Design a protein with these regions (language model features):
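N-terminal Rossmann/SDR dinucleotide-binding element
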Residues: 1-125, 129-132, 139-143, 148-151, ...
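Conserved beta-loop-beta element that borders a ligand/cofactor-binding pocket
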Residues: 233-280, 284-294, 298-333, 385-392
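Glycine-rich "substrate-gating" loop/helix at the edge of Rossmann-like oxidoreductase active sites
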Residues: 290-294, 325-338, 358-370, 398-400
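Alpha-helical substrate-binding/gating segment
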Residues: 307-309, 342-357, 364-421
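Mid/C-terminal beta-alpha module of Rossmann-like enzyme folds, strongest
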Residues: 382-491, 499, 506-513, 517-520
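Non-catalytic pre-domain segments flanking phosphatase-related domains
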Residues: 537-581, 816, 820, 844-845
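C-terminal cap/substrate-recognition subdomain and adjoining C-terminal extension
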Residues: 563-568, 572-574, 650-651, 657-845
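Active-site neighborhood of HAD-like aspartate-dependent phosphohydrolases
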Residues: 569-624
Length: 845
């Protein structure tokens, strides 16, 4: 039979010394790389000097358990105090007392090898703190870790019991201390007692009596359902309809970035959709049964399954409320990762959360992490109850209530005195909250998301650059933040509206059993917390430090960051600097170069015809360019068919001096020369034609461009002899060049202006977005890439299309031909009508 609830009298004996009770013991800890687990391991090693600690860590393909323990636990700043106290002996002490065991709580048998089983068999106490702690964890992973994990740990202990009896015949059975959550009480109101749901169900008590969810659930069916949902969603995500949507969205985000990048983004969108659907499925199932989300739901069922499946084990259940930064140990404010409150606080301080649901008179039940770690250690030292599974709440709401309204007042006052600064260097004024219902806040944020999403789509579709593109990037960032704020309301709103009060009778009984000395070292009484001091002087300073928000005027910081990035880019240590041409070196493009060359020797009347034809085709040209830059260039360059190569090359010299030089960016030219002066190899990589860029060749060490073939009569065929390097081809060509020259792309720079240049920018260590269009501006802002805004040499007005000098006395080689009369016609541009023909060349007169 499972153990039943114990009485307070059963645990009334004094504990002379926690360190003494655990001396010589081996304590096996799961979840040691997490927030609570790291604090627990550090506290054991520092405050229980004669115990051994073993940690279960899942190996990765790159790192074994020992490497992860060293990197993710021992090197964490949580250990700074112990490192300072031990000095030079720190490494040897850690090596002698801390061991890492490879394994995984989501695997039956924990994935232990023989050595791992030996260590588990020797453990006197197992603290199971591993959990999928995110409130938005996918239902299948929450089931594997939170629901099945505790029972798997119990099964592994039982499986090792025979070995323990053989190897350690004088030792008592292993004591399992499992960390659950107080919020498995669900959405009930009133006092939630330290009782197992199975005991409440067995006694016939109603849910409202114990303020816990006592709904009977078929746990096996829930596990099967979660696994099946994953399988079903994975299958649906691969249907043609879904894949088309993901691909379309990827193209909208990245434009003509290239097949591989678009495929990667579409696959990421598919995976995100599966995950979001799993989260929603978990939330819906949990709320249908009385829990706010999959976290509380799976933790509750995991606790039930453990005590039902393993009645033979001595078990203590520790249920913390919301765990936050340390009150004092190892140092005030220590935190690892953001918990529940931090994202809400930072979003509020940024002015993003104008409202948040909650009951101002309600209790915000949070507890510092060091109090939880101390309570777990004390529970381990006290040992298990002789006849029952002991349950301990580690919560503050009853013992030392902290009202939600007061928390908001403290946060508002603190950020009024210490505001966060926005990107313009202006302090952000925090709003007043009126504590509306969750539904109202969600509707407000949903409307804001819709409006910002529309603005983002509109701006990204416009051909804007520079400051206007930066505006689009800011809108995208704002939309992303608003989307995140909505998710916070959906995730955490239920917790700020919780009216359950978690009693701590057994916790305080345990506290009263401690000696005065242990109460100093292992403090876990919530009554010691001064909430005003904790929020103002401990928690909020820690939150802003870890959030890395701007707490001073932003402009000097931004200027300093810009200068640091520029110094890194212009370091002599760099190897290569690659430059795009259009809107990076010159404010021009292949269409303008063609228009200038095509009209160079045309009389006035024919000029109007050719320009009108190009403008008429502009929408289809733009659509093709956005879809595939390579297809656009191949199609557009067919217009050069029949042109005399010698004449075009001669005219291209004029093009450079009359147009390109005027539209060049002096800062770009200076930057190329600066790189050359620093000894960097300079490369121009462009889809423009060789005769257009030929005058620029002296500026660069290498020019990689497109080239048209020539027939036996010296005329351009309109077909490419050397393909234009676009999309992924740019990255591949540059990588080949760097490899052949012994250059490291990780120590190289790339300058480009468009999202279609992403492969080029991503293949180097120092990407620079120059005069970026809207999509690239948003990407660069998100990734923290260096950005340059360069002005052209001539700032005068620009014509729609530039025209070559009027010279009707020389040869004219352009005319309109009927496509139907040509046997080898170039591919027609998508979207053009039969009468909208390409302008092609003919023999010179």
């Amino acid at each position: 039979m499972p153990r039943t609830a114990d009485t307070l009298a059963e645990i009334s004996g004094p504990i002379e010394s926690i360190a003494g009770a655990l001396a010589g013991k081996t304590i096996f800890v799961t979840g040691a790389t997490g927030f609570l687990g790291t604090a627990l391991v550090e506290r054991l090693l520092r405050s229980v000097p004669d115990c051994q600690v073993a940690v279960l860590i899942r190996p990765t393909r790159r790192s074994g358990a020992a490497d992860r323990a060293k990197r993710e636990i021992v090197r964490n700043d949580c250990f700074n105090r112990l490192r300072s106290e031990l000095g030079d002996s720190f490494d040897s002490v850690i090596e002698s007392r801390l061991s890492a065991v490879g394994g995984d709580v989501s695997t039956d048998g924990l994935g232990l090898d023989d050595e791992g089983q030996r260590i588990l068999a020797s453990a006197d106490v197992v603290v199971h703190s591993a959990a999928a702690v995110a409130f938005d964890a996918p239902i299948d992973s929450a089931v594997e870790v939170n629901l099945l994990g505790p029972s798997r740990v119990g099964a592994a202990i039982t499986a090792c019991s025979a070995r323990r009896e053989t190897d350690h015949p004088d030792k008592a059975p292993t004591h399992l201390v499992t960390v659950s959550t107080a919020y498995l009480a669900g959405t009930h109101m009133g006092h939630a007692t330290e009782i197992l749901a199975t005991d409440a169900m067995r006694s016939g008590a109603r849910a409202r009596t114990h303020t816990t969810v006592t709904t009977e659930v078929d746990i096996t069916a829930e596990v099967d359902s979660a696994r099946n949902i994953r399988s079903e969603l994975e299958s649906e995500s691969r249907t043609p309809t879904r894949l088309t949507r993901f691909t379309k969205k990827a193209r909208n985000e990245l434009g003509a970035a290239g097949t591989h990048l678009l495929a990667e983004r579409a696959e990421k969108l598919r995976q995100d959709w599966v995950r979001a659907s799993l989260v929603e499925a978990g939330r819906a199932r949990a709320q249908a049964l009385g829990w706010p989300d999959a976290y509380a739901f799976t933790k509750a069922l995991g606790e039930r399954l453990l005590v039902t499946n393993h009645p033979e084990l001595p078990i203590t259940v520790v249920r913390p409320s919301i765990i936050e930064s340390a009150l004092a140990e190892p140092h005030p404010g220590w935190i690892r990762g953001f918990r529940m409150a931090e994202p809400i606080i930072i979003s509020y301080a940024r002015g993003l959360l104008k409202e948040f649901p909650g009951i101002p008179e309600g209790v915000t039940d949070v507890v510092p992490v060091d109090l939880v770690a101390a309570a777990i250690i004390a529970a381990a030292a006290a040992g298990p109850s002789a006849s029952s599974t002991r349950v301990l709440h580690v919560a503050s709401g009853v013992r030392n209530p902290f009202r939600y309204g007061h928390l908001v007042e403290l946060v508002q006052a603190w950020f009024t005195e210490h505001p966060i600064y926005d990107s313009d260097g202006q302090p952000i004024m925090v709003p007043d909250w009126s504590f509306p219902g969750r539904g109202r806040v969600q509707r407000q944020l949903s409307r804001a998301n819709t409006a910002l999403g529309f603005a983002e789509r509109l701006l990204s579709a416009l051909p804007i650059r520079g400051d206007r593109a930066e505006l689009a990037a800011r809108v995208e960032e704002r939309r992303s933040l608003a989307e995140r704020a909505l998710s916070y309301v959906q995730l955490y709103g239920a917790y700020t509206e919780t009216e359950a009060l978690f009693t701590v009778d057994r916790l305080i009984e345990l506290w009263e059993r401690l000696s005065e000395a242990d109460r100093e070292v292992f403090c876990f009484d919530p009554a010691v917390i001064d909430w005003d001091d904790y929020v103002e002087n401990v928690h909020l300073p820690s939150v802003v430090e870890h959030a890395r928000v701007r707490m001073t005027s932003a402009r000097p910081a931004m200027e300093a960051r810009h200068d640091r990035a520029l110094r890194a880019i212009l370091s002599p240590d760099r190897h290569l600097a690659a430059f795009d041409l259009e809107n990076t070196i010159v404010a021009s493009n292949v269409v303008e170069s063609y228009a200038w060359l095509a009209t160079r020797h045309l009389p006035l009347g024919e000029r109007a015809t050719i320009i009108a034809r190009i403008l008429r085709e502009a929408p289809s040209l733009l659509a093709l360019d956005r879809r595939d830059r390579g297809d656009f260039l191949r199609s557009f360059y067919r217009r050069y068919e029949g042109a005399p190569e010698e004449l075009v090359r001669r005219d291209a010299e004029e093009l450079f001096h009359h147009l390109l030089l005027r539209r060049s960016f002096p800062a770009a030219v200076a930057r190329v020369r600066k790189h050359k002066a620093l000894g960097h190899r300079t490369v121009l990589i462009t889809g423009a034609l060789d005769f257009v860029v030929e005058p620029m060749r002296p500026l660069f060490d290498e020019v990689i461009c497109a080239k048209l073939a020539t027939d036996s009569n010296g005329r351009l065929t309109g077909r490419l002899e050397r393909l234009p390097p676009t999309g992924e081809a740019r990255a591949l060509v540059l990588a080949e060049y760097a490899s052949s020259e012994g250059l490291d792309l990780g120590q190289s720079i790339a300058y480009a202006d468009s999202a279609s240049d992403l492969p080029l920018l991503e293949c180097v260590g120092f990407p620079v977005a120059v005069n970026p269009e809207a999509k690239l501006a948003a990407i660069a802002r998100k990734r923290g890439w260096h950005t340059e805004e360069w002005e052209p040499a001539s700032t005068g007005s620009r014509s729609v299309l530039p025209l070559g000098p009027l010279d009707s006395g020389l040869s004219r080689w352009w005319e309109r031909l009927d496509m139907s009369q040509k046997t080898d016609s170039p591919r027609k541009i998508s979207g053009t009508s039969p009468g909208n023909r390409q302008v092609l060349g003919r023999k010179a007169r």
